[in-house]
Amino acid sequence: MCSHFTQDFLPVQGIEDSFHKLILRRYEKCGHDNLQLRKGCKSMNVCKVQKGVYNGINKCLSNTQSKIFQCNARVKVFSKFANSNKDKTRHTGEKHFKCNECGKSFQKFSDLTQHKGIHAGEKPYTCEERGKDFGWYTDLNQHKKIHTGEKPYKCEECGKAFNRSTNLTAHKRIHNREKAYTGEDRDRAFGWSTNLNEYKKIHTGDKPYKCKECGKAFMHSSHLNKHEKIHTGEKPYKCKECGKVISSSSSFAKHKRIHTGEKPFKCLECGKAFNISTTLTKHRRIHTGEKPYTCEVCGKAFRQSANLYVHRRIHTGEKPYTCGECGKTFRQSANLYVHRRIHTGEKPYKCEDCGKAFGRYTALNQHKKIHTGEKPYKCEECGKAFNSSTNLTAHKRIHTREKPYTCEDRGRAFGLSTNLNEYKKIHTGDKPYKCKECGKAFIHSLHLNKHEKIHTGKKPYKCKQCGKVITSSSSFAKHKRIHTGEKPFECLECGKAFTSSTTLTKHRRIHTGEKPYTCEVCGKAFRQSAILYVHRRIHTGEKPYTCEECGKTFRQSANLYVHRRIHTGEKPYKCEECGKAFGRYTDLNQHKKIHTGEKLYKCEECGKDFVWYTDLNQQKKIYTGEKPYKCEECGKAFAPSTDLNQHTKILTGEQSYKCEECGKAFGWSIALNQHKKIHTGEKPYKCEECGKAFSRSRNLTTHRRVHTREKPYKCEDRGRSFGWSTNLNEYKKIHTGDKLYKCKECGKVFKQSSHLNRHEKIHTGKKPYKCKECGKVITSSSSFAKHKRIHTGEKPFKCLECGKAFTSSTTLTKHRRIHTGEKPYTCEECGKAFRQSAILYVHRRIHTGEKPYTCGECGKTFRQSANLYAHKKIHTGEKPYTCGDCGKTFRQSANLYAHKKIHTGDKTIQV
């Protein structure tokens, strides 16, 4: 106020009092403590003389105010008290202005006014371009820049431009890594105040924004705005490229980048670029290992708040999203959205390289890496690289053996959530995916997709090497490895490598002994769910796969597929070493081990090595005595299921496989194939020791025991060891008297099926083998092979002790006992021992008095057929054995042998 103007009307003290009252009336809300007059400004005389009447007072007042207010925290002059108070609250953190609706406090009255507009729903500012409404004029101006593309704020470091100065300021923190905002409760620092506020809301659970329609509350006003559009159905943004309508401008901006391919947000660590900044923020946490969001129930930490939000539903069991088609519920709306495409068949994302379409954009991105070969995620333990971070995370659990997913019903833990879900479906029987063509239901959507290709015949993948067409990309990738020989999946226990990760997983269970799949009927456990699925058909008797050629049915489609090759003669798998072809890839693999000598499976009991795990399993059953497969007809139990099948066919007489050369029928295709080698003379398996060749690899294996003298099969009752399991079984039958094979014609029983088969030919008179040399007809292939050696003089079985050779291996075995003194067959009555079971068999007749052979001439009976044969010569007068020295004749060769000693004078042998 000007002293020249006022001194005529008021005294000086009165003017000063009036000034103070005016100031305090204007700023009465601020409090006396916040006002401080500067030195030299306590009187009104400091103002120079001003011209004017009453207006001079206000002018003088405004001029004086610029000098009288200062901040207590630091010496700073303000032109108005409001600025002084604002600076002070910035230092103290005071929030004087409180919202009556939600209780939130603010430092500035203008912020409170702005906040109240959220509750009132007031949006007075409208965009002329799109018609979008805003609560504040600044937001409208900001929004207009989307349409104009104006970005006046540029980063000097990287050249990136922004439409807001605040965005530029926040962006600069990426370069200098500044974190200006700290959480008071947890001492965490953030680069942006919004991140700090979001972090606080997670811990406090504060959700101030509530939907008027349904009452749902949100942490952020933007989330509420987005949610409200669900009720209104408002989608104001339409994409010119694909026609998609989108509800928010930010989502619209992100969507446009799908078409342009723009990825403006780049990671400084690895150089990977992203189309949205939030994805970059989430990606950075891969490098930093930061997981700021922790579950209060189980303590699990997450990189993203959204993942924590969804994770909580595991504990609550909440699945708020329901499919209208099948009623399936989901924890996330995104999963429901993707699930619906199963019913609609929609696949909007297409690969430009191969034309394959996908229901999810992430699946397309994942697929593209097949073509590029990109594997950016590397394991620090073993160096293995992956094309997705989830695969790397899952892989790491191999090293850590972490199993975070536990089945609540059965307590089993799994390393992958997919394995847990699969495990649950096995027990619940849930099959949500149904084929529209035939109604068949499946546990997994991928199984349904694979099945649907049966109806469509679609096989989009063709192998350039062999021309094979394949239905799925994963199967195609596996198939290519057959030609390349690539085995990228290696077992850390034994070093064995595999072409697929699933095969490695199954293989690992050999080392761990894990058998997670259990049969509900018999309790038998399996390493693979597929084997359990097929095993169940043993109990149900289901054989859904039928051969069109011969009508034979199978439990597995794979068995039918292989079986068809018997009719077609197809052998697509060829050995590069010897050129031999096979109908099955597994047979080729097994055959290759003959050349390599590879034996990966070792028996812990006896230390023996095996080529196949099934052989090892079979060996184990010898020691455990386990025989899980039981015949329903006679109750006999078997160790391998193949023996039960063989036994069943003997009882039923089933012989589906017939030889085109001689008409002989067999119960198994392998027996037919083996038989064919008699006609072809094929013997591909050769012994390195003696050069002897065999038609079967197992015959070669057993033959080698002649040289090594290995006897792996031991009788538990008597302690005797044998080189062959058949010899052990035969030995056991001698002691037990077990005779399981009965002739339907005469009722005679036999210990071995081969003996029954030989016996039956007496009734049928069937003798399919005819000798070209002498015309003799013979009943069995083994006897025919022995007979031919009479003409050829071949004696391939040689005694290592004395060098004597024999025409058959059985004769050699019997001969060896002369040197060893071994007499394995003992009479239970008198304890006498014999070298051969046949001699024991005849000896027993002494005790039983049995004489089954009767002379037709005189009625005399004999224990042995040989004795009857010799006796008959008395009636006929036949004496076929002649002495070369004196011409005397004899009925028996033994008598001739004794007579010769008269001429030689040898008295060492007496008859």
From Swiss-Prot:
Subcellular location: Nucleus
Keywords noted in UniProt: DNA-binding, Isopeptide bond, Metal-binding, Nucleus, Repeat, Transcription, Transcription regulation, Ubl conjugation, Zinc, Zinc-finger
Pfam families per record: zf-C2H2 (PF00096), zf-C2H2_6 (PF13912), zf-H2C2_2 (PF13465)
Transmembrane segments: none
GO BP, sorted A to Z: regulation of transcription by RNA polymerase II
Keyword Repeat found: yes
PROSITE patterns from the UniProt entry: ZINC_FINGER_C2H2_1, ZINC_FINGER_C2H2_2
Protein's UniProt keywords contain Ubl conjugation: yes
Superkingdom per UniProt: Eukaryota
Cellular component terms (Gene Ontology): nucleus
C2H2-type zinc finger span: 69-91, 97-119, 125-147, 153-175, 181-203, 209-231, 237-259, 265-287, 293-315, 321-343, 349-371, 377-399, 405-427, 433-455, 461-483, 489-511, 517-539, 545-567, 573-595, 601-623, 629-651, 657-679, 685-707, 713-735, 741-763, 769-791, 797-819, 825-847, 853-875, 881-903
Cross-link Glycyl lysine isopeptide (Lys-Gly) (interchain with G-Cter in SUMO2): where in chain: 478, 649, 786
A GO MF label: zinc ion binding
Function: May be involved in transcriptional regulation.
Entry's family note: Belongs to the krueppel C2H2-type zinc-finger protein family.
Name by which UniProt lists this protein: Zinc finger protein 721
Provenance organism: Homo sapiens (Human)
Taxonomic lineage of the native organism: Eukaryota, Metazoa, Chordata, Craniata, Vertebrata
Gene: ZNF721
